[in-house]
Amino acid sequence: MIDITLPLTDIHRHLDGNIRAQTILDLGRQFNIALPAQTLETLIPHVQVTSTEPDLVSFLTKLDWGVKVLASLDACRRVAFENIEDAARNGLHYVELRFSPGYMAMAHQLPIAGVVEAVIDGVRDGCNTFGVEARLIGIMSRTFGEAACLQELDALLAHREKITALDLAGDELGFPGSLFLSHFNRARDAGWHITVHAGEAAGPESIWQAIRELGAERIGHGVKAVEDRALMDFLAQQRIGIESCLTSNIQTSTVASLADHPLKTFLEHGVLASLNTDDPAVQGVDIIHEYHVAAPAAGLSREQIRQAQINGLEIAFLSDDEKRALREKVAAA
């Protein structure tokens, strides 16, 4: 179902949600960190979703083992490099990797700005090695509160030229976007793009708030947008992208089944929705699965899947010249 004549993108992909089980095992042994299992086979159920989780917060606990083994900046650098290697193996031409430096630093009190630098270094080295194009999106983990998010923002701003956009992720219900207005004002002043996780656990009002008050140009997940016809019209007319993550939304119980997922409705309404993975290692999926298995199960036609692939580049945080160059590069391959 993937059109090989077009760039393949993944623009909603958490770097800290894509830490290989083998890497968790390796780093756990290297730093003498107690893990819930000592073999790859027995570790996987602890670090990967093997059935549907009851809610988003339960799903997020599966990510914790990955960051618990990040006991050094070199470990962060390794994980970043491996993210690009994984993207190359999946056939991705362009990826936007988002990461929460405070979350990655938390278990071992690493310097947050140092984590940002390590991720930048690892991604750069990976891109040079594997030929994938990548951009970095900094995440503020709302679950840890306004002050912690301010620390993350300061660390990201220390490397502002290497960061493309700012995101807000975590407990959407407990920590609404209205708490973070000043944070996003600073991000926009820095010239960054804005994307926000919204309409995943909360309703359409969360999406409206992200757009109107935080300046969101894209929305992560946004499944609840279908509950508000005026919002759907606004998204289409203003070309505000939706970063859809099919399998993830089932695993978090955000959507009951793939057949119920609103991606098809988004595309029919003219909303610029794209196909993405979210947390590939935790979910046990890759972008190929999303195109070949999840999208057809969600009722998308071949042409709609192709449109979602086109949308991925259309709403990417790249200049028109960069998009054109990527299209030409893929067409010539």
From Swiss-Prot:
Where along the sequence do coiled-coil regions lie?
none
EC number of the protein:
3.5.4.4
| UniProt cross-references to SUPFAM superfamilies, sorted A to Z | Metallo-dependent hydrolases
Residues flagged as site, Important for catalytic activity: 221
Cite the InterPro entries for this sequence.
A/AMP_deam_AS (IPR006650), A_deaminase (IPR028893), A_deaminase_dom (IPR001365), Ado/ade_deaminase (IPR006330), Metal_Hydrolase (IPR032466)
Q: Which reaction does it catalyse?
A: adenosine + H2O + H(+) = inosine + NH4(+); 2'-deoxyadenosine + H2O + H(+) = 2'-deoxyinosine + NH4(+)
| Annotated protein name in UniProt | Adenosine deaminase
**Source organism per UniProt:** Salmonella schwarzengrund (strain CVM19633)
